[in-house]
């Protein structure tokens, strides 16, 4: 009986490892595909002080307002990335102006870069961890908590209190992902890593 139990336990562990590897591979494939279809927006505060965090949100609003007014309509993701790359001076100027208007003299930088992001949920959309292209705005020492959203497709909150993202942005995201990929990113939780051990042990 003990040998039988150990055999089943080893089989269950091997099954779990195989399932984990398959799920990890599927998540990596999803992340790679998703990364090619979005442009994220990342604002890093000077520090975690209340004043610096408040300033971060004001800079965020200024940059989003600037881009909403200037970004041509109907661009695809690659054209949006290129537009952002060629307009970083204007984006930085908008951020700098907001910083000065609020009585600070922090330096600020703006660049389109590739950065690593951990798993993040924004509204009802979850992005798996990995490298993504992002418009990155750094205020001062950029050591404070960051704020992020997705510029393309537009998933930046319309209602920050209730975490409502624009339906148009979600529809664009749905168009470029498979049905299963879209289901995964809108499932409202972390990506599942399924192990068969509990089920197998429960059947003993």
Predicted regions and their residues:
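Aromatic-capped interface at the extracytoplasmic side
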Residues: 18-33
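Soluble extracytoplasmic domains of inner/organellar membrane proteins
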Residues: 124-191
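Hydrophobic membrane-insertion alpha-helices, especially the h-region
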Residues: 2-19
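Generic structural motif
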Residues: 46-48, 115, 140-142, 154, ...
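Early exported N-terminus immediately downstream of N-terminal targeting peptides
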Residues: 37-88
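Mid-length scaffold segments of soluble, non-membrane domains
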Residues: 77-150
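Low-complexity, Gly/Ser/Thr/Pro-rich intrinsically disordered linker/tail segments
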Residues: 185-204
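Intrinsically disordered, low-complexity acidic/polar segments
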Residues: 50-52, 119, 146, 158
């Amino acid at each position: 009986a003990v040998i039988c139990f150990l055999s089943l336990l080893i089989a269950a562990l091997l099954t779990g490892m195989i399932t984990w590897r398959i799920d990890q591979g599927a998540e990596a494939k999803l992340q790679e595909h998703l990364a090619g279809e979005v442009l994220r927006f990342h604002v890093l505060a000077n520090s975690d002080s209340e004043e610096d965090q408040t300033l971060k949100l004001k800079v965020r609003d200024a940059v989003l307002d600037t881009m909403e007014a200037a970004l041509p309509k109907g661009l695809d993701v690659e054209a949006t990335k290129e537009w952002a790359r060629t307009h970083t001076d204007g984006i930085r100027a908008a951020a700098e102006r907001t910083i000065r208007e609020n009585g600070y003299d922090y330096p600020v930088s703006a660049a389109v870069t590739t950065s690593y992001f951990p798993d993040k949920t924004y509204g009802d959309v979850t992005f798996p961890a990995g490298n993504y292209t992002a418009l990155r705005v750094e205020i001062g020492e950029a050591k404070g908590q960051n704020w992020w959203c997705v510029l393309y497709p537009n998933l930046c909150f319309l209602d920050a209190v209730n975490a409502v993202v624009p339906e148009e942005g979600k529809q664009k995201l749905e168009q470029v992902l498979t049905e299963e990929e879209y289901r995964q990113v809108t499932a409202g939780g972390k990506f599942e890593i399924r192990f068969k051990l509990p089920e197998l042990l429960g059947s003993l």
